[in-house]
């Protein structure tokens, strides 16, 4: 991830993800460090780099906790943003699941990448359902 960051790949992908992050997390102020950590986590997950997504995810939750402190809310109670981030993160949209391909190759699969298509479909569906659920839940909570 550090190489991708220095090469400008993460920055370029982050700009493309900004509209999605603003849509899913409208209450996070522009320029807040939580946005950067959330975006980095999403990019790492999409690229199938779960090991690289974990630190960014932990940093995102910490930044969201700090945001709750700034708002004067109890940090020990999960905010809507924390719940949304957790659901989007768990749904884990992935284009290429490097780990599954590696395991299939290691255990002698004739075509270890055959799972990629089904994996993309499954993670796209789970992410869409998760995002829709969060938007509906958050809209009802604000009424």
Predicted regions and their residues:
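Juxtamembrane and boundary regions of transmembrane helices in multi-pass small-molecule transporters
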Residues: 114-143
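Membrane-interfacial segments
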Residues: 4, 8-9, 68, 107, ...
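Hydrophobic transmembrane alpha-helices that form the pore/transport pathway of multi-pass ion
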Residues: 46-86, 105-107
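Mid-bilayer segments of alpha-helical transmembrane spans in multi-pass integral membrane proteins
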Residues: 42, 50-51, 89-95, 127-128
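The feature identifies polytopic integral membrane transport proteins across all domains of life
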Residues: 34-45, 78-88, 110-117
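Transmembrane alpha-helical segments of integral membrane proteins
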Residues: 95-106
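Intrinsically disordered, low-complexity non-transmembrane regions of multi-pass membrane transporters
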Residues: 19-26, 30, 66-77, 139-143
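Membrane-embedded alpha-helical segments and adjacent helix-loop junctions characteristic
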Residues: 1-65
């Amino acid at each position: 991830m550090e190489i991708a960051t220095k090469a400008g790949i993460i920055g370029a992908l982050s700009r493309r993800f900004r509209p999605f992050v603003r849509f899913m997390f409208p209450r996070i102020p522009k320029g807040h460090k939580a946005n950067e950590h959330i975006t980095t986590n999403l990019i790492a997950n999409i690229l199938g780099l779960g090991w690289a997504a974990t630190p960014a995810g932990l940093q995102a939750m910490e930044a969201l906790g700090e945001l709750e402190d700034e708002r004067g809310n109890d940090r020990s109670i999960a905010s809507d943003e924390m719940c949304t981030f957790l659901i989007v993160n768990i749904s884990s949209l992935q284009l290429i699941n490097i780990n599954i391909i590696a395991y299939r190759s290691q255990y002698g699969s004739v075509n270890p990448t055959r799972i990629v298509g089904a994996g993309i479909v499954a993670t796209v569906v789970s992410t869409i359902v998760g995002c829709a659920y969060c938007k509906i839940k958050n809209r009802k909570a604000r009424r």
